[in-house]
Amino acid sequence: MHSQRIAPYKTLILNELRYYPLELDLTPFNALIFTSKNAVFSLLETLKDSPKLKMLQNIPAYALSEPTAKTLQDHHFKVAFIGEKAHGKEFVQEILPLLEKKSVLYLRAKEIASSLDAILLEHGINFQQAVVYENKLKHLTLSEQNALKPKEKSVLIFTAISHAKAFLRYFEFLENYTAISIGNTTALYLQKQGIQSYSAKKPSLEACLELALSLRIKEC
């Protein structure tokens, strides 16, 4: 949901999603891990005519955040747990004791920011990973880049490391830009690029938009 009190704002799309079909036999699994809504959308798209989708919907799902959990619930998945912190490192610590003696399937992107997989392995969790989507950089011509470049004094919201990488691939981060990160890993990535960012109270787009509004009010 977008805040209706914030105007004008634009969505700058620099990546495109590529979905990959799930090829695994689902019989062994009795727990699913979702850290992104995109993994859910990939399953809905690639398995819409397959009995595998119904099987997945009946396996308890462990969701990183409220938005991911809501997407799962809206599409009839069985949500067993929702992360309280909604950040990768904290989430894996929350679910470790819940996943003991379970056979886990982690549905993920091709590139991930957290070390969730390594931590599960380190703690002896019986799990497999399936790459079900990828964030691909869109090709932009020079004229498209010029047309899309944010104006000076813009507030920029970065909802993933992949979005920050894409932005910096095409644009310079001006000194008078203000950056907002949706989560800790995105903020850390920006910091490594020499960009300080504000972090929203919750890792959601709505919280980021509310923060953007409060920053604008302070400037006035």
PLM features: what roles do these ranges have?
Residues 1-220:
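Signature of uroporphyrinogen-III synthase
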